[in-house]
Amino acid sequence: MVGITSFGAYVPRLRLQRKAIVDAHVWADPGLAGKARGERSMCNWDEDPVTMGVEAARACLNSSESAPGGIYFASTSAPFADRQNAGILAGALGLPEEIASVDITASQKAGTGALLQAIGGVGGGLYEEALVVASDKRRTKAASPGELAYGDGAAAMTIGSSETLVDFVAAHSATVDFIDHFRGSGEDFDYTW
């Protein structure tokens, strides 16, 4: 049965205290005061979704004896629009050039989409094992709900059919154009209601 065979994660060490965000903007939006607890992860100047993805994938592949046949990179904030980010990951991880690589972007469903594609690839016999990496460094408007909620980080997992930690039993997808937020091409920030 196809399922998750290993996993890894990377969360940047740098933290942003939510209280610092609220203190800077509470004069304009007093409602922020109730969200001042805790902290969120934040990339340092030399971190981006690809570098975080490499670290998560290294943690994931540590116990793997063979190279995956496919790599899926999912992100809404990939550093390159016209260069394959999954290819950069494959090179940084020392994976063979024959690996199939795919970038899945432009939706917050990119991670689950990549996971389902990898499950389909392994289940359909395209390759024995696939690597899925989801990583984001979301830019947000100052004092927006996103600035308080989003944290930077990456997760990786291998999908295979032997020695699974978690078996894939079923999936259900729904596709509805529900516009609660969006980010247009060329825009830096999400538009939210």
Stretch-by-stretch model annotation:
Residues 1-47, 144-193:
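Condensing-enzyme catalytic core mediating Claisen C-C bond formation in acyl metabolism
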Residues 1-2, 66-69, 96-99, 124-130, ...:
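Short coil/turn connectors at secondary-structure junctions
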Residues 4-6, 60, 71, 89, ...:
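Buried hydrophobic positions in well-ordered alpha/beta secondary-structure cores of metabolic enzymes
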Residues 31-34, 40-48, 77-129, 135:
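Conserved catalytic cysteine-centered active-site region
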Residues 46-47, 52-57:
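N-terminal low-complexity or amphipathic/hydrophobic leaders
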Residues 56-69:
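Phosphate/pyrophosphate-binding loops at sites that engage ATP/ADP/AMP, CoA/4′-phosphopantetheine
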Residues 123-157:
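Flexible, glycine-rich active-site loops centered on histidine and acidic residues
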